[in-house]
Design a protein with these regions (language model features):
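...captures the hydrophobic TM-helix bundle architecture rather than a specific catalytic motif
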Residues: 1-169
Length: 169
């Protein structure tokens, strides 16, 4: 489904064995978290809000693993940053929660910009933004002079999202 045709962005998804495995992990673990949160936060005035935020986070993660367009993947990637910010700052009345949420958003947002640059370069080198088509041209992409910068930019985004050294706090 064409989403932003002038930029070559399509609303496309791809389900293979690996994507299915991760989708099942996301929904399975997400369901367990829902059950736990319901018991742990029973009677909490904002229980409905935590459920909405957990659904947003889970849906964003599903979008990341199922997206077949690099820029669509980026949109879902950033939605995980936003939902993480909202979940970390769930107890927003506490200054510590607000500070931690902002710090997480700043770090993951900065890494997301690096990832976006890497994905745009990848699309330029590969001639498409469709991940399934890019996979076919892997050898040509690895042979390109921009391969190392592309790899480092995408890894920077992944490392900031997963709080890998030196992006952990």
């Amino acid at each position: 489904l064409s989403w932003v045709p002038s930029l070559g962005i399509s609303f496309s998804f791809h389900l293979d064995g690996l994507a299915l495995l991760f989708a099942l992990l996301i929904t399975g673990i997400g369901t367990l978290i829902f059950i736990y949160a319901g018991g742990y936060l029973a009677g909490h005035r904002d229980l409905g809000r935590i459920y909405v935020l957990l659904l947003l986070f889970m849906g964003s993660m599903l979008g990341v693993v199922l997206a077949d367009n690099a820029l669509l993947l980026f949109v879902f990637w950033e939605l995980t940053s936003i939902s993480s910010y909202l979940l970390i700052g769930f107890d927003h009345e506490r200054p510590e929660a607000r500070a931690a949420a902002f710090q997480a958003l700043f770090i993951t947002g900065s890494g997301g910009l690096a990832m976006l640059a890497g994905l745009v370069l990848l699309g330029q080198v590969g001639g498409t933004l469709e991940l399934s088509a890019l996979a076919v041209h892997g050898d040509a992409i690895r042979a390109d002079a921009l391969y190392l910068p592309i790899l480092l930019l995408i890894l920077a985004g992944a490392f900031t999202k997963s709080a890998q050294f030196p992006f952990h706090f």
